[in-house]
């Protein structure tokens, strides 16, 4: 049986099937269509302008390595006129980040791009190894996500760049859409599918995004005044990125973070992979669903906050103290749970705490003596300003229960 020919060039032998389109094509045609699609994403969304200084978030993994390679190739092929830099964050994870940084340093030599490395230790005085020893593995991703985004902004400010590009791919975006739906965070659905984000509310991840602390012309910092973030791989499938790295023989680090196996995102990822196996277009379908969902004006208004500089570090924030400083305060005080969770959940914890304070009850006994009792009132889960039960509408049960024997 004769080998199948590439459906694009109809000359070379087909060596792979594209996960995105199921086309059987040769290596060279795969490289061409992959790079052309990324170029189309960049051009159609006006991601850059000539003369931009662009920092590539480099972790040494497949996504950032392929992104660095493609950005260099496309910048030269289509004459974007960009000044490219590699920006890497050292979270301080022994046996993981130290090894991946060696890959980043090799990439720097291979692509001849300037490299800037910033570490959690120098920025915050805590490495992720230190944080995990203090908080355990349950909520460590919260700390890492907040610290990493701020570190990227600070690194970008140090490099004087206009734009940060990250290797978030179509799978990542679809996972984030699913996570926001599962958590009922409808307000974030509208912006998690944006290819360009800027300022405190421009998070592509599942954590709160805040800006950068260096002063800008508007007085609220670089994160709110100029540094953009974009995802050139927003429509690129993860499987195709892996195939590109494999056939191009790119040098990348493939070990998963040792602290992330129990991350909430992992469950969304597993579900997405199951959907993709049944229907490959599910990834793009989910992204388009997130883009097409209409968020009510009430929800939009509830998410609007006035930006200001953190009183402690100067980082732009929607609160007087930024999330990173709150988390650091918890670590320093030995109360690492401080700042973890949503604002709503923290308010509930505050109500629990207030209602669980010890109170003193004074009564007079039959013989005229004063008796003091100390007790902790039981928390009922009802806020102080909750309406009385009698004012609430009666909702009949949906199902009748037969208690007869």
From Swiss-Prot:
Which keywords accompany this UniProt record? Cytoplasm, RNA-binding, Transferase, tRNA processing, tRNA-binding
Family to which this protein belongs: Belongs to the TtcA family. CTU1/NCS6/ATPBD3 subfamily.
The protein's Enzyme Commission number: 2.7.7.-
User: Is Cytoplasm set as a keyword in this record?
Assistant: yes
Q: Where in the cell is it found?
A: Cytoplasm
Q: Name one GO cellular component term.
A: cytosol
Function field: Plays a central role in 2-thiolation of mcm(5)S(2)U at tRNA wobble positions of tRNA(Lys), tRNA(Glu) and tRNA(Gln). Directly binds tRNAs and probably acts by catalyzing adenylation of tRNAs, an intermediate required for 2-thiolation. It is unclear whether it acts as a sulfurtransferase that transfers sulfur from thiocarboxylated URM1 onto the uridine of tRNAs at wobble position. Prior mcm(5) tRNA modification by the elongator complex is required for 2-thiolation. May also be involved in protein urmylation.
Q: Which Gene3D superfamilies match?
A: HUPs
Protein's pathway: tRNA modification; 5-methoxycarbonylmethyl-2-thiouridine-tRNA biosynthesis
Task: Provide the GO MF annotations for this entry.
Answer: nucleotidyltransferase activity; tRNA binding; tRNA-uridine 2-sulfurtransferase activity
Official protein name in the record: Cytoplasmic tRNA 2-thiolation protein 1
What GO biological process terms are annotated to this protein in UniProt? protein urmylation; tRNA thio-modification; tRNA wobble position uridine thiolation; tRNA wobble uridine modification
**What broad class describes the main subcellular location of this protein?**
cytoplasm
Ranges for the region named Disordered are: 197-217
């Amino acid at each position: 049986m004769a080998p199948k020919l590439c459906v694009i060039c109809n000359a070379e032998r087909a060596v792979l099937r594209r996960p995105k389109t199921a086309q059987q094509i040769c290596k060279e045609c795969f490289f061409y269509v992959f790079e052309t699609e990324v170029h189309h994403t960049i051009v159609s969304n006006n991601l850059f302008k000539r003369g931009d200084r662009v920092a590539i978030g480099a972790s040494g993994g497949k996504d950032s390595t392929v992104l660095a390679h493609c950005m260099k190739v496309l910048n030269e092929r289509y004459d974007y006129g960009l000044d490219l830099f590699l920006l890497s964050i050292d979270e301080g994870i022994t046996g993981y980040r130290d090894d991946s940084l060696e890959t980043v340093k090799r990439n720097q030599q291979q692509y001849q791009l300037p490299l800037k490395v910033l570490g959690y230790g120098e920025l915050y005085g805590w490495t992720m190894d230190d944080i995990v020893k203090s908080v355990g593995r349950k909520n460590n991703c919260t700390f890492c996500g907040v610290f990493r985004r701020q570190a990227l902004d600070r690194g970008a400010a140090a490099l004087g760049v206009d734009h940060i590009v990250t290797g978030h791919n179509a799978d990542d975006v679809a996972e984030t859409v699913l996570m926001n739906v599962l958590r009922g965070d409808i307000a974030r659905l509208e912006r998690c599918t944006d290819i360009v984000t800027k300022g405190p509310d421009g998070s592509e991840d599942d954590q709160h995004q805040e800006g950068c602390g260096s002063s800008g012309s508007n007085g609220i910092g670089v994160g709110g005044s100029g540094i953009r973030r974009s995802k050139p791989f927003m429509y690129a499938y993860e499987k195709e990125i892996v195939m590109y790295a494999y056939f191009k023989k790119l040098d990348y680090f493939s070990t998963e973070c040792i602290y992330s196996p129990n991350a909430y995102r992992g469950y969304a990822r597993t579900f997405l992979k199951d959907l993709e196996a049944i229907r490959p277009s599910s990834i793009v379908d989910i992204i388009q669903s997130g883009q097409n969902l209409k968020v009510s004006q009430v929800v939009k208004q509830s998410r609007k906050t006035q930006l200001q500089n953190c009183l402690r570090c100067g980082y732009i924030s929607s609160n007087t103290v930024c999330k990173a400083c709150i988390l650091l305060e918890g670590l320093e005080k030995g109360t690492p749970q401080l700042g973890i969770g949503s604002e709503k959940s923290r308010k509930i914890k505050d109500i629990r705490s207030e209602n669980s304070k010890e109170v003193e009850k004074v009564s007079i006994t039959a013989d005229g003596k004063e008796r003091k009792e100390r007790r902790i009132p039981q928390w009922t889960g009802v806020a102080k300003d909750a309406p009385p039960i009698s004012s609430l509408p009666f909702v009949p049960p949906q199902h009748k229960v037969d208690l007869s024997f």
